[in-house]
Each structure stands twice: as C-alpha cells, then as structure tokens.
Amino acid sequence: MDEFHXYGKEDSSWQQCFLYPLFFQEDLYAIYHDHYLDGSSSSESMEHLSSNDQFSFLTVKRLIGQIRQQNNSIVFFLNCDPNPLVDRNKSFYYESVLEGLTLVLEVPFSIRSKYSVEGMNEWKSFRSIHSIFPFLEDKFPHSNYILDTRIPYSIHPEILVRTFRRWIRDAPSLHPLRSVLYKYRNSPDNLQRSIIIAPRVNTRFLLFLWNHYVYGCESILVPLLKQSFHPRSSSHGSFPDRTHFDRKIKHIIRNSRRNSLKSIWSLKDPRIHYVRYAERSIIAIKGTHLLVKKCRYHLPIFRQFYFHLWSEPYRVCSHQLSKNCSSSLGYFLRVRMKPLLVRTKMLDELFITDLITDEFDPIVPIVPIIGLLAREKLCDISGRPISKLYWTSLTDDDILDRFDRIWKNIFHYYSGSLDRDGLYRIKYILSLSCAKTLACKHKSTIRVVRKELGPELFKKYFSKEREFDFPAFSSKAAARSQRERIWHSDIPQINPLANSWQKIQDLK
C-alpha cells in the first residue's frame, strides 16, 4: 500500500489506470481478515470462528473472478443454502470482497483528498465536529439568511459509477463496483430499487460511497458558490481606508449613474459560508432576499443537472436569522442583537457610546430534551422525575455513574449556549430521578437515601466543578463560563438526544 501511494505521487495517471490488479492482492484481504478478528468481540464472531477455522484467499480470488460473470448469484448468495452456518461463512466472504473493493477504491480517493487539503487555494473538506460550532459562532453574526438543505440519500447506482469514472480511467475496476451496486439494488429486501447511502451506516463500503458522493457534490458546489459570491473588484483594493466608503463613492461618481450602480453593487459585498454535518448542510448568506430566493431555486437545479438527482424543493428551507430560528445539530440557531457600552476619551472629555452588534446565540431545546428523557423513563411528559426501575438491580456506584454520565454529556454538548437555566432544570430532573431510583432499590424514601449516602455523594457526581475539566483553574473556568461560552473539544459526535430530536424535526 505504501509503495502504491509512492507511485501515485510520482505519476498520477498510473494510480488511475491500474487499479484492477490490486483486487487479486492477498494483502488487502489479510488486512480486512485481521481487522475483522480483532475488532469483533461478540458471540456471533466466536461462533463464526468455530465454524470457519481457516480463511482461504483462493476462495476470495475465485469469488472475484465470478463477479464479472453473467450469473453471479454464487457470489452474492441470494440463492444460497438455508443452513445458517453456511450462510454465515458465505456472508463473511461476501463482506471480504466488499472490503477489498473498498480498500482498492480508497487509495486514489485518499491521495486526491490529501492533495486538495494541502493546496493553498483549494477548498478544505472533511473537518471534525469540533470546528463546526466555532465556525458558526464566527460566521453567523455576519450573515442575515441561512439555507438549510438535506442531501438526498436515495441514489441510482449508475450515478455512483459515473462519479467514479470522472477520476478513475481503469474500466475493469468499475465492473465489480457496478455488479455489487446493481445486485444490491435488485435484492428482494430493497423495495425502492435504489441505493440508499447515509452517513450513519455501519458498513465501510456504504460509508465510502457516502463520503465519495458528498465529496463530489461539494467539490463542485462550494467553489462555484464562492466564485459567484466573491467577484473580483478593483474598487476595494485601491482604498485601504473603507470608513464611509459607500458615501465617498456616491459623492465622487454621482454624475455617472451606470458606474455608480456598479460600484454600489460591489460594495454590498455578498458573502456565503458553507458547513455540513452528516446529511444536513447549512449555507449562510449575507445578501438580499432576492439573492436567497435565487439560491434556493438554483440548488435543486444544480443537483439535477450535475448529479442527476431530483431534490424536492421542500428540502431547501430559508430562514432569516434576525426573525426565525433554524433547528440544526440539536440546537435552535439564531442571531440576536447585543448592546455594548463603549467609553471614548478625547482630551478631557469622556463620551459613552452605545453600540449594537450581532451575536450568535444558540438555544437549547429544553422541551424536546424533556420529551426524550420521558421516552427513556427518567421523567414524565411534564418533566416530573420518576425512578428508573430497570437500573435498580445495579450497584449504587453504577447507578450514580450512569446518571452522571448522562448529565455530563448533555452539559458538555450544550455548553455553547449562554442561557443555561434550562440545563440546570435538566440537572434537577436527573439528580432527583437518581435519588428516586436509589430509594426504590433500597425500599426507602428520598430523604432517607440522602441521609444515609450523605449530600457529599451527590455533590461529587452532580457538582459544578465536574462540569469543567480544568483542575488547576476550576474556579476561574466556572466564573468565566457564566459570561462566555465554552465549546468542549471532547465531543466525538452529535449528542444522541440531540440526534433523536433532530430526526423528529426532520419528520415534521
């Protein structure tokens, strides 16, 4: 693999034209075989090992050779023996073929994405979730409209094959991909007759298809939007001081109406920012309402003509940040006006000036979170705490750890909101539900539980000091958190509660 990467750097045409021989390299399937044995620790994998002690690479090669045959039911095992052990072995070889196909196709894709990231003027994709919230905090106050779009996930298999043909010239390597996609499309379980890819799937093959599909869409869409919204203008470069710039230009070229209109249009300086997480993408726009309507109209047309995807108009929603909120990433996103008092001293006089600035203010959806906690049997619909009867068989430390873990995850994810009164309401619900669970386990009351365990035990698990991971500066961090938002860097993904609430919002 390392040698192949080296050859790809020296000659980019070689890595695009000679992919098919890599399907017959045993090392690729050995990588997946070792990964499968090391990564799976379930009882199902142990049963599989007992029924299949030896892994034959020759069998994998024969399966690869049969992929290009017309009757490939032997490979994809749609008409296979009903014996469960045989089915498990065949499905294991089928997964091995898919993993080998994925490993081969990932090599040129990884090289291309690496070069695009290293480029100075290239658009950088595939950032982590840690950079999304600071990006929104930095760019949203300078925008007045947002477009909330959903990327279609039901795709015809031939569209995926054509996207690979744009940068892979090796036609034989695309035949196995086409066979796999069409076989999955025509399977009896697939009623929609299309490939359904999503960012939350478990298989590596579908994850790779999703990443490649999104990369192909964004690599064309984002530079095109930036080029349209950032035209080159000579008016801005020749004036380093832009104070009252609009007024100066109007005064200088008042006689020439045509030039004045051009200059005023360039001074509006429309901007666009793009961010995506999973299948939801947000386009923040600084411009007029007419410009937003044009973008909302042209986005489905762009996807239809470039990628042959029919995107329904209702999938693109526009919101004005100063009036409406947009639900995304488990937050209600909005921009509010923040007044500031600025003291200016000139000679012996002191002036106080009121300034109004826009501030990114995400809102915590308290009512939906309470509804999701009620679904988990931690409270009722009105937010009244109840005992978790399913956890009464655990030890006291395990019960406290589970409730504390739920609170810590919720607080860390929603710590970016300055209005935390609702969060402390969630904390009260969880702490009281924990006390009721312990009281139900010991067959006593909440007062007796608090008296026996002591208030220090609840302070240890539900204290404000544990909300911050700054042992040397815990007091300073707690004081600073009351007036500043802190985005915690230990968030690996979107919160499960926020994810569930977002799915409910999408259904609405």
UniProtKB/Swiss-Prot annotation:
- Report the function annotation for this chain: Usually encoded in the trnK tRNA gene intron. Probably assists in splicing its own and other chloroplast group II introns.
Q: Which GO terms describe its molecular function?
A: RNA binding
> What family does the Swiss-Prot or TrEMBL record give for this protein?
Belongs to the intron maturase 2 family. MatK subfamily.
What InterPro entries is this protein classified in? Domain_X, Maturase_MatK, Maturase_MatK_N
Q: PANTHER family, alphabetically?
A: MATURASE K
Per the record, what is one GO cellular component?
Answer: chloroplast
Q: What is its main location?
A: plastid
**HAMAP family under this entry?**
MatK (MF_01390)
Places the protein is found: Plastid, Chloroplast
Q: Name one Pfam family in it.
A: Intron_maturas2
Q: Which organism is it from?
A: Abies bracteata
Q: Which UniProt keywords apply?
A: Chloroplast, mRNA processing, Plastid, RNA-binding, tRNA processing
Please give the superkingdom of this protein's source.
Answer: Eukaryota
- Is Hydrolase given among the entry's keywords? no
User: GO annotations under biological process?
Assistant: mRNA processing; tRNA processing
Q: What is the lineage of its organism?
A: Eukaryota, Viridiplantae, Streptophyta, Embryophyta, Tracheophyta
Q: What is this protein called?
A: Maturase K
